[in-house]
Regions:
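Active-site neighborhoods and metal-handling regions in enzymes and metal-associated proteins
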Residues: 1-410
Length: 410
């Protein structure tokens, strides 16, 4: 898969070009403790390697394609303390990059200078991975632009990020199977959680049951799980998960599962101990109906902007029928969809006006948030957008009122 991804990228760049990608580096948490390493997703997409301090170089010269990888210097002492450094054999097996084209970082500067100088007469273009949010966070590619231009002012600089975003947007069968696997684990984790709901007195206990089951499947959470009961569901990214559960409340659970680096992102709402009340039922039914309509309505030629506009229209009309006359923005204040893949909010930087395209995996997540009712309802599914009819990958995860109530009452 990864060599094929590189070949697709090569087709998108100019001849006489060099593209560089950095895997990222570990960040200190406090003292000598590090945060868990999170690989740069474009680097991973092209290599399958999850190792910090590594640089991928792709060279297209006179229609020849070459791939090189530089990895951290091998340190025998480091290996006694950490098990996160892959050897060249392992890297070749995963990435299909030739063993002889993998070098240690100590050789990088001399090697790179030689390559650039060989290109001088060809007016080369050098691609760096510079995401649209590069000014908010440290960006290796952005930093390298200035270093390259100061050393080799005759080169032309280009951004590879838009190319990678468009390649990653449409998923191949292998990627879709990874997402299906994540959703399958999500389903079983959620059912396990429902089966243990009666034992729970606090939000964090619900979260704990979910995490226990998914970790037993060698998976991990894609983001901080949201378990928001009652008024807490009015806050979209509520993550304290520490409130005592109230039998009369609805609980919103927004969670994601990662396996093989691909994510699910699914939200379900359920009553605590009892059935939905009449007004809870009405609001839930409106959100559910909107969810179902949008799953079937969206087409590859539609944009995220189209999807959001139509979803808000359905919610607004429904709320008006229920007697809520204020503007819909008072009750719905987030996007109805996002792309899904290596990141939970995948390929950030794609224009919301751009067609979604076939074989994109997206979320469908309408919601309503009503402060005076202490009620937040969001129903989120993950679908593949297809010309001949979309596929709801999370269809088996219960969302009908009767299904939810039967699970709670058990």
């Amino acid at each position: 898969m990864f060599s094929n991804n590189r070949n697709r990228f090569f087709k998108c760049i100019n001849d006489n070009s060099i593209a560089l990608f950095y895997s990222g580096h570990s960040h200190y948490k406090s003292g000598d403790q590090l945060f868990p390493f999170e690989v740069n997703k474009n680097f991973y997409y092209l290599t399958g390697i999850q190792q910090d301090g590594s640089i991928l170089i792709l060279i297209k010269k006179s229609l020849m394609q070459k791939t090189f990888l530089f990895i951290p210097n091998i340190n025998p002492i480091h290996k006694l303390w950490n098990d996160n450094q892959l050897n060249k054999e392992q890297i070749t097996n995963i990435s299909k990059i030739s063993y002889n084209d993998i070098y240690e970082m100590k050789d990088f500067n001399v090697w790179l200078n030689q390559q650039i100088c060989e290109f001088k007469s060809l007016s080369p273009k050098v691609y760096f991975d510079i995401p649209y949010y590069h000014k908010k966070y440290y960006c290796w590619g952005y930093e390298q632009v200035y270093k390259f231009l100061s050393s080799w002012p005759w080169i032309e600089i280009a951004n590879s990020s838009p190319i990678l975003l468009n390649l990653r947007k449409q998923k191949n069968n292998e990627e879709i199977n990874y997402i299906k696997h994540a959703i399958d684990i999500h389903y079983h984790s959620l059912i396990y959680t429902f089966n243990n709901l009666k034992k729970c007195q606090y939000e964090f206990e619900i979260s704990a049951h979910f995490h226990y089951f998914l970790e037993m499947q060698k998976a991990k959470n894609a983001f901080e799980t949201i378990v928001a009961s009652g008024k807490n569901a009015l806050t979209l990214h509520y993550n304290k998960n520490n409130s005592k559960l109230n039998d009369e409340d609805i609980c919103l659970m927004d969670a994601g599962v990662v396996i093989n680096n691909y994510s699910s992102d699914i939200t379900r709402c359920f009553p605590l101990k009892h059935k939905f009340t009449s007004i809870q039922n009405q609001i839930y039914d409106l959100v559910l109906n909107t969810n179902k309509i949008l799953i079937n309505w969206v087409k590859p030629e539609h944009s995220m902007q189209d999807l959001n506009r139509y979803g808000k229209q359905i919610l607004a009309q429904g709320m008006l029928k229920l007697g809520f006359v204020e503007k819909i923005e008072n009750y719905f204040y987030h996007s109805i969809s996002h792309y899904l893949g290596l990141d939970t909010h995948d390929v950030l930087g794609i224009s919301p006006e751009e067609p979604i395209g076939e074989n994109s995996v997206i979320s469908i997540e309408p919601g309503l948030y009503i402060e005076h009712l202490n009620l937040g309802i969001r129903i989120e599914d993950n679908i593949i957008v297809k010309k001949q009819g979309n596929i709801n990958l999370s269809a088996k995860i219960p969302k009908e009122i009767a299904e939810i109530e039967s699970l709670i009452i058990k």
